[in-house]
Amino acid sequence: MKILYAASEATPYAKSGGLADVAGSLPKALVKDGVDARVIMPLYGDLKYREDLEYVTNYSVPVGWRSQYCGLFKSVRNGVTYYFLDNEYYFKRRGLYGFYDDGERFAFFSRAVLETLFYIDFTPDIINCNDWQTALVPVYLNLYYRHLDKFNRIKTIFTIHNIAYQGKYGTEILEDTCGIGRRDQHIVEYDGCANFMKGAIETADKITTVSPTYAQEILDPWFSYGLDALLREKQYKLCGILNGIDMDANNPATDPYIPFNYSIDNFGEGKAACKKALQEKFGLHQDGSPVFAMVSRMVGMKGFDLVQSVADGLVDRGIELVILGSGENQYESFFSDLCARHPGRVGTYIGFEPALSQEIYAGADAFIMPSKSEPCGLAQMVACRYGTPPIIRETGGLRDSIHDSTMGEGNGFTFAGYSAHELYEACCHAQDAYNDKENWNNLVHHCMECDFSWDVSAKSYEGLYNEPANLW
């Protein structure tokens, strides 16, 4: 089985969000299982490990009515071959996204992915595309390449990591920039504009999302950002596969950033030492109170409006809070003020420090994730890996990965409705459970037993890749 994994970012080379973690981890897990999985991505101006890249060739790529240069480089890391597509006009910039011509940049990249197959000794069975930046790959494949022998058996999978970002532009971009003639523009047109993601949903052989629950949620108008009717029509080719985490990179037994390494065999001693260090760092009282933490972008979608409503009440109940993140000014201001109002009870760090986040995962007693919507979420899995039971709202991948322990089973605390009252009640349940040390230790042990490795996700993807031809 040969898989070409097309993504706009992948660790360790370039990252702006969770997509990079997936593109850097899933192919590695597939290769470990004997799949010939390769990654193709842009060669950005601030790409890491540029010194490892090997020049292969260059060629022209059609972009509307003109052609653009494309240089091809490659590198091999952890057994995975990475291809990098170079065009300095499009990609030699600071940052990955947010430019006025992003539509043109990634239309070029999508077309270049297919053109590259003429110049490498590799013909994939499946091209796995990811998010709107690669959404035109299946569109171009069906329109301009399917009749060629090299391409006529290639299947495509389109993975939706976050349906909120669809790649929407004015329809004038279609012919001039994307090279899609008027006869075929209906494939990409939606709601009066060009919608790259819509084109992929129409033309890809399979559609996946990053969790089973999210696959069901996006059929509902509340979650779909306008694409629910189309997705219900294409539901026969839609499924959800839960993402994983890098269990080696997130390992409390070897993590160089935490003050005391521990495993499932000595977590009591280890977490106590990490908690003490965390409380000292944030100036919190060491009086036996539980420490509940959040590591997240400070935006409403992550549930910060709920936390804002219950924070004072939680502190009054004897819970200490540690908050790490940045984002909307209203939340940054509130949690900075909260820290000032409750010295010794609340610690806030505005910004993001990877090392500090690891210290929080290890030192906190519980981890709060009350998201309004969460396609998959990785933080709750990392928290479990470090023996820190999550408190989550039942949505998306949170619902698929965390199960309520109130009745003696499960690996965290959950609530269903998006309300401050339900979040407060879940936190109270967690505090009560924390005070029962024997049951709490059993819960921590259960959390650390959870297998959220990419090996599990890779098996699910392999099952999809190997489905009989009649199911494609």
Identify the meaning behind each predicted range.
Residues M1-W472:
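Catalytic cores of nucleotide-sugar-dependent glycosyltransferases that transfer UDP/GDP/TDP-activated
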